[in-house]
Amino acid sequence: ITLEAKGNEQQVNLDKLTVAALEGETELKALLDWQQAISWRGELTLNGINTAKEFPEWPSKLNGLIKTRGSLYGGTWQMEVPELKLTGNVKQNKVNVDGTLKGNSYMQWMIPGLHLELGPNSAEVKGELGVKDLNLDATINAPGLDNALPGLGGTAKGLVKVRGTVEAPQLLADITARGLRWQELSVAQVRVEGDIKSTDQIAGKLDVRVEQISQPDVNINLVTLNAKGSEKQHELQLRIQGEPVSGQLNLAGSFDRKEERWKGTLSNTRFQTPVGPWSLTRDIALDYRNKEQKISIGPHCWLNPNAELCVPQT
């Protein structure tokens, strides 16, 4: 380790901090100033980093450069990464990260381009979440996730778009994944489609379909979630087929933004469980008052071939 630095009561200037490790070298140059706001400027360089000996199950060879600057003042912050480059390989998978971005505590972001690549898999983010306008795209194209991370497998492809304005944002999503595996969990297919807008009230639709969820003692053939409508009138349907639990429910409701009150009805609800089938004998009325942090649940009964469980209004 070698260190070259100087400073005073107002700032510290780190001319060079060099750490020789992992068969390579890491070098940091930085300036930290606190005269008025806390501000920083830094440059981190990775040269010939090799983790094969220390982490044989996760061998990596990396080179890179990360430049950053920013400030923190009065509970607000801003930061910029004018240069981000990382190259090399991880477990024989090529690694490439390249991009620039800047943002602040008001969640305003400008991303001219951020590209991530691991083997045949890639993801890209580009656009801005501005003071007024929103125009951001995020894409993923991962045809070969097998062993990209230990225990991971499958494919994924999708697109997320943010459009509109800060006053009336719109979110569109279309994502598909197949043959997903993580350790002992496997999922044959996942599909997510959504189009959500927010103007004077939130409205849109969301469809989620998940097929063949498997792990020890769990085998779910199909899960579907469908939601649509607006704040004033919306509905949701959930269906589950599999073991040890299967079933369905419908939820319909309306939200009064002025009163901060949501009223709804839970209906068409039944489940098959290890202790037999259970079903509602009547719809359940639900009433949530956000100002009072209070929820009321109407009286209802759950029916089983061998029992009936009734709950008074709560």
Residue ranges and their predicted role:
Residues 1-314:
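Interface amphipathic segments
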